[in-house]
Curated annotation (Swiss-Prot):
SMART domains: DISIN (SM00050). It comes from Echis pyramidum leakeyi. The disintegrin belongs to the short disintegrin subfamily. Expressed by the venom gland. This is Disintegrin pyramidin-A. Disulfide bonds join 2-11, 7-32, 8-37, 20-39. Coiled coil: none annotated. A motif (Cell attachment site) lies at residues 24-26. The lineage of its organism: Eukaryota, Metazoa, Chordata, Craniata, Vertebrata. One of its GO terms (cellular component) is extracellular region.
Length: 50
């Protein structure tokens, strides 16, 4: 499925809902979606959150 990335392990996508980037400050966690090796941005984050 994948070669590398925060949502890839052993050439497989990590399960949807797996945290791939922990929240910092008042930010929110980012989660794998089970379909990509990248760590998608949490859609519930504010517009100006990093």
């Amino acid at each position: 499925d994948c070669a590398s990335g925060p949502c890839c392990r052993d050439c497989k996508f990590l399960k949807e809902g797996t945290i791939c980037k922990r929240a910092r400050g008042d930010n929110m966690d980012d989660y794998c979606n089970g379909k990509t090796c990248d760590c998608p941005r949490n859609p519930h984050k504010g517009e100006h959150d990093p």
